[in-house]
């Protein structure tokens, strides 16, 4: 029930990764990357399907060898989500996966080779109508830029990116997006800000090698949150040393928190104190797990007492305000006569939230049909 974010997005060109639109006002796409051995086709396919179930828009797959390229062909046949092939060092692998139907090529200018090899990759991408992501990384800058700047700086990352943007421009190829990732939040943020002023291509956001599940999520939320709040960014990936499924969840949580893109339930819950009338923490944890399959955007407030409960509930799709033995229940901002038993809170809320999701989905389908007419 909250309003959309007061964010004006940076204008950028439109490209497509498979059927997913990127840039020019398209929804910000959430990306992840497999961490299986690509040659283990079954494991990689299983992981991609797990990512699909939590709503991933694009999946990147590392293709380090020709054997991995052959495995990629089999993987591509078994999944629905667009796949980006991550290519380093051997440009010939890019040519092979392009033949096998890759949806996007990610190349690192610092290690893909000389200009002639880049030209060959670009000509191949043009032939198959495949976009490219120029992936600049603070940890793998070109040697001459390392010598020039001494260490990764925003200017160094910008110069690396612009060097290869200019190269693609000379080759008359404009189906590309760019990233300038770094593990340091300030370095990454400033690099993206500089790049956003220089080009109008879509930008892929990320804080590279951000860390484990908790620290990496925090670091990514700060860095990407700053950029997204300034309207910068068209796709994103949360790089975590964790299950890739968690990357997707954190990515959507960041977009949801900024009210940029809603998917699933936004739980509003108090941290609890001695005033709580029911187990708020247990209730929220259980509902988050039980309702992971719900993709309908909803704000659900779960507050343990009457201090802030009514205020939050009146601006939520559904809300609970803690009371003695039974708690107040709100729907669409209106308090209902019906109260919920504190001892059976989780089951009652799950049933009501699922029913509400069904109603909202049906209404949305009707709206879409009317627009199409």
From Swiss-Prot:
Its cofactor is [4Fe-4S] cluster. The gene is ispG. Pathway: Isoprenoid biosynthesis; isopentenyl diphosphate biosynthesis via DXP pathway; isopentenyl diphosphate from 1-deoxy-D-xylulose 5-phosphate: step 5/6. It catalyses: (2E)-4-hydroxy-3-methylbut-2-enyl diphosphate + oxidized [flavodoxin] + H2O + 2 H(+) = 2-C-methyl-D-erythritol 2,4-cyclic diphosphate + reduced [flavodoxin]. HAMAP family: IspG (MF_00159). The lineage of its organism: Bacteria, Pseudomonadati, Pseudomonadota, Gammaproteobacteria, Enterobacterales. This is 4-hydroxy-3-methylbut-2-en-1-yl diphosphate synthase (flavodoxin). GO terms for molecular function: 4 iron, 4 sulfur cluster binding; 4-hydroxy-3-methylbut-2-en-1-yl diphosphate synthase activity (ferredoxin); 4-hydroxy-3-methylbut-2-enyl-diphosphate synthase activity (flavodoxin); iron ion binding. NCBIfam families: ispG_gcpE, PRK00366.1. Converts 2C-methyl-D-erythritol 2,4-cyclodiphosphate (ME-2,4cPP) into 1-hydroxy-2-methyl-2-(E)-butenyl 4-diphosphate. GO terms for biological process: isopentenyl diphosphate biosynthetic process, methylerythritol 4-phosphate pathway; terpenoid biosynthetic process. PANTHER family: 4-HYDROXY-3-METHYLBUT-2-EN-1-YL DIPHOSPHATE SYNTHASE (PTHR30454), 4-HYDROXY-3-METHYLBUT-2-EN-1-YL DIPHOSPHATE SYNTHASE (FERREDOXIN), CHLOROPLASTIC (PTHR30454:SF0). Binds 1 [4Fe-4S] cluster. It holds the Pfam family GcpE. It comes from the Bacteria. It comes from Erwinia tasmaniensis (strain DSM 17950 / CFBP 7177 / CIP 109463 / NCPPB 4357 / Et1/99). InterPro entries: Dihydropteroate_synth-like_sf, Enolase-like_C_sf, IspG_bac, IspG_bac-typ, NO2/SO3_Rdtase_4Fe4S_sf.
């Amino acid at each position: 029930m909250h309003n959309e974010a007061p964010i004006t997005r940076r204008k950028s060109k439109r490209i497509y990764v498979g059927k997913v639109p990127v840039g020019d006002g398209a929804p910000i796409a959430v990306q992840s990357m497999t961490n299986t051995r690509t040659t283990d086709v079954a494991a990689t396919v299983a992981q991609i399907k797990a990512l699909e179930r939590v709503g991933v828009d694009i999946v990147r797959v590392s293709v380090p060898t020709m054997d991995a390229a052959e495995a990629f062909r089999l993987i591509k046949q078994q999944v629905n989500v667009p796949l980006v092939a991550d290519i380093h060092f051997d440009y010939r692998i890019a040519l092979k996966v392009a033949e096998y139907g890759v949806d996007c090529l990610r190349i690192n200018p610092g290690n893909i080779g000389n200009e002639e090899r880049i030209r060959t990759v670009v000509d191949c991408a043009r032939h198959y109508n495949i976009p490219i992501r120029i992936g600049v990384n603070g940890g793998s800058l070109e040697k001459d830029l390392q010598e020039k700047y001494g260490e990764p700086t925003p200017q160094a990352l910008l110069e690396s990116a612009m060097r290869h943007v200019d190269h693609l421009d000379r080759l008359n190829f404009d189906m590309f997006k760019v990233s300038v990732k770094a593990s340091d939040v300030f370095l990454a943020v400033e690099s993206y800000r500089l790049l956003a002023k220089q080009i109008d291509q879509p930008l892929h956001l990320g804080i590279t090698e951000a860390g484990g599940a908790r620290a990496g999520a925090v670091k990514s939320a700060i860095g990407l949150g700053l950029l997204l709040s300034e309207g910068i960014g068209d796709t994103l990936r949360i790089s975590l040393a964790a299950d890739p499924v968690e990357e997707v969840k954190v990515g959507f949580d960041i977009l949801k928190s900024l009210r940029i893109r809603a998917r699933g339930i936004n739980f509003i819950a108090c941290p609890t104190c001695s005033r709580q009338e029911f187990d708020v923490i247990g209730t929220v944890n259980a509902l988050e797990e039980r309702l992971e399959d719900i993709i309908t955007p909803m704000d659900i407030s779960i507050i343990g007492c009457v201090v802030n409960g009514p205020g939050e509930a009146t601006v939520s799709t559904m809300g609970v305000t803690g009371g003695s033995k039974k708690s107040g229940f709100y729907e669409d901002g209106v308090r209902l006569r019906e109260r919920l038993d504190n001892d059976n809170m989780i089951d009652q809320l799950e049933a009501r939230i699922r029913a509400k999701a069904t109603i909202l989905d049906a209404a949305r389908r009707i709206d879409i049909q009317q627009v199409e007419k």
